Amino acid sequence: MKTLGQFIVEKQAEYPNAKGELSGILSSIRLVAKVIHRDINKAGLTNNIIGTSGAENVQGETQMKLDLFAHNTMKQALISREEVAGFASEEEENFVAFDTERGRNAKYVILTDPLDGSSNIDVNVAVGTIFSIYRRVSPIGTPVTLADFMQPGNRQVAAGYIVYGSSTMLVYTTGNGVNGFTYDPSLGVFCLSHENIQIPANGKIYSINEGQYLKFPQGVKKYIKYCQEEDKATHRPYTSRYIGSLVSDFHRNMLKGGIYIYPSATNYPNGKLRLLYEGNPMAFLAEQAGGMASDGYQRILDIQPTELHQRVPLFLGSKEMVEKAQDFMKTFG
């Protein structure tokens, strides 16, 4: 069976001018996945990573101990790479410039949600790590600037996630399809288990927090009712499945077919998920697997960011389902 390391080397060989920089970054992320996997598997045995840290992130959300552990693990792994010029995280207010000679001469910046769904960790529900990689736009040889991180998602060079569930999987794209690798803890390696993943064009699963129904826009309410109606021709009603972890919900829907929705609401008028740390990387993966990602009106990957922690409504998954939901939004608002 092909390992992630072998796969990365093979793909690099397809580009004669490649210098292995992106491969090196992916290797560091592979190491991060192993470290976080190890500590998540001990979550019930120690209090060091379970519970709240007593601090809040820039969005005013309570940070879990494991949020900070995952954030620091990712940050330290990337600082050691000569290919990375800077780093931005959902857990940190400002971006971090790796202002060393190596960092100033590096070509790439990384954005990450270090631990998606971390509030689920103490009840043993799957969580994940999301990452996004861009080529910097500021001059090589200088420290990175905010502009390096404020690029639309269509300029990503790679994106992916790690899901820590019944098994740990690393799923990523470099713009040439989506591949998934399952961690074998007995060997300490990720093995290619899901090659060239394709999202079914349609599905029977919709994933949304229906407890917030009264706060949703009319278009979302109408779409939920559409999903619940009985219609044999379109195989409705659909099944509602919502874990509360973007990575876990999207991973299931990508393999089985479905739509994930985190819309705007009266308490989150701009949506709750972050464009740069969650929306863009998941949208890149969805499109590379044949799916679609929208804010209800436009393509996620075409949105020009205006803030580092900008929020966005997210409709993500099977192409036909996202198109239908978008039709409801455009009709009913």
Curated annotation (Swiss-Prot):
Pathway: Carbohydrate biosynthesis; gluconeogenesis
GO cellular component: cytosol
InterPro entries membership: FBPase_C_dom, FBPase_class-1, FBPase_N, FBPtase, Fructose_bisphosphatase_AS
Binding site for Mg(2+) 1: 90, 113, 115
UniProt catalytic activity: beta-D-fructose 1,6-bisphosphate + H2O = beta-D-fructose 6-phosphate + phosphate
One GO molecular-function entry: fructose 1,6-bisphosphate 1-phosphatase activity
Chief localization: cytoplasm
Highest taxon in the source lineage: Bacteria
Short name of any one Pfam family annotated for the protein: FBPase
Record's subunit section: Homotetramer.
Assigned protein family: Belongs to the FBPase class 1 family.
Full protein name: Fructose-1,6-bisphosphatase class 1
Native source species: Pasteurella multocida (strain Pm70)
Gene (name only): fbp
